[in-house]
Amino acid sequence: IHHPHSQIVGFKDYDYHQDIKPFHFVGPSIIEEDGLTVNLSQRPIIGFYEVNLILKDRGKLGKFVRYMQLTADYFMHSFVSFNDSYNIFFYDFPADDALYVKIIPRFLTNPLYVGYMIPQIANGGHSARFIHALQQRLHEV
């Protein structure tokens, strides 16, 4: 999809806590304030540049959101010339009251995998057509 859009995804039968852990939000500090942290993930979910924002003091929500905006703007206008998109993912952890956010420059990868390690697979009909077509091609050998 090549147009600006927002998408909210809810999971009925999936708990991302099985795959996403607090260590995914640790890394070299970009900004460190009392109750608010911005860092570069040293254990990214998908790789390279994942900016983590962690809000522990809800009184700093305005500043937190501004840091989110500035990080997204950086990825769009100052990061690399061929990047024109980003994803923002929100997380919580039951043992922690903090709000966790990951902002990731968007390249050609399924966003559900980028944020939650959920691989995208084709539905049964598409899979069957693919298998049939490839079988036909391989049987030509």
Can you say where each PLM-predicted feature lies in the sequence?
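HIT superfamily nucleotide-processing domains
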Residues: I1-V141
